[in-house]
């Protein structure tokens, strides 16, 4: 997702509230430490300034969990902003199910919610804004298969359970592989997790177990790995592993690559 779309998200929230002297918009990311979320923050601040300059005074609140697997902290942030009766919430839920009740409670309390980046299993939100993650994953799977000549062994290293954006991308990746019967998927049930350390350990375990393979590593990237950007706005990176295997890094958001 393009982080500069925060202006659109703010507009969607504003269209659902009764105008007051100053509108208070809470933007709640999945995490706050990585480059992607810092760029999202910059986009939110830009939207705040532009709306205020255009005659709609907006005060932005930015708060989220430090780690992108801390469901409890993100739930608490949503509940706290609901209790403060902000004008609206813009939320990137790190779990598609765990944030359903907090969002429902916010809407019931009169606080409209826009979901971005990763979907929520709910119909309570005003709108949902994101890239086509299934299509992005499909592009990655098709490209990896072609780079391997349509033959070989494949490992899919997933991100984490409950992350709707990466789950859609993983589904697209696997769907693309169906067109290549000579490719063998030997692992698709392991998770990288939210940090460099957990991703590195997961990948090392798979390397030790399976040896030379082709990889689809869907969740990881950092600002140094931006080599190819496709139509879906997703960065990808190819490289040759030390074991001779071909790797594809095809991220969802700005998390450090473990390689």
Residue ranges of each PLM-predicted region?
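A residue-level marker of the well-folded mature domains of exported/periplasmic proteins
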Residues: 19-259
């Amino acid at each position: 997702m393009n982080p500069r779309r925060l202006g659109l998200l703010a507009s969607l929230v504003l269209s659902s509230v009764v105008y007051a002297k100053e509108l208070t918009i809470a933007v709640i990311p999945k995490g706050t430490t990585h480059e992607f979320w810092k760029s999202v923050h910059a986009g939110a601040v830009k939207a705040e300034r532009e709306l205020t300059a255009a005659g709609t005074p907006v005060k932005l609140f930015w708060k989220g969990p430090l780690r992108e697997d801390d469901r409890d902290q993100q739930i608490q942030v949503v509940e706290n902003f609901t209790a403060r009766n902000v004008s609206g919430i813009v939320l990137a839920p790190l779990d598609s199910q765990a944030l359903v009740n907090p969002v429902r409670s916010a809407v019931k309390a009169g606080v409209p919610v826009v979901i971005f980046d990763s979907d929520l299993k709910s119909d309570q939100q005003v709108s949902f804004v994101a890239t086509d993650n299934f299509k992005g994953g499909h592009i990655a799977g098709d490209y990896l298969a072609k780079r391997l000549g349509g033959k070989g062994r494949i490992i899919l290293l997933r991100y984490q359970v409950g992350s709707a954006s990466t789950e859609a991308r993983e589904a697209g990746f696997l769907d693309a592989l169906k067109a290549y019967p000579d490719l063998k998927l030997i692992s698709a049930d392991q998770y990288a997790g939210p940090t460099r350390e957990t991703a590195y350990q997961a990948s090392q375990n798979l390397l030790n177990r399976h040896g030379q393979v082709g990889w689809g590593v869907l969740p990881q990237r950092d600002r140094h790995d931006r080599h190819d950007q496709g139509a879906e706005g997703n960065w990808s990176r190819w490289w040759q592993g030390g074991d001779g295997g071909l790797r594809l890094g095809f991220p969802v958001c700005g998390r450090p690559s473990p390689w």
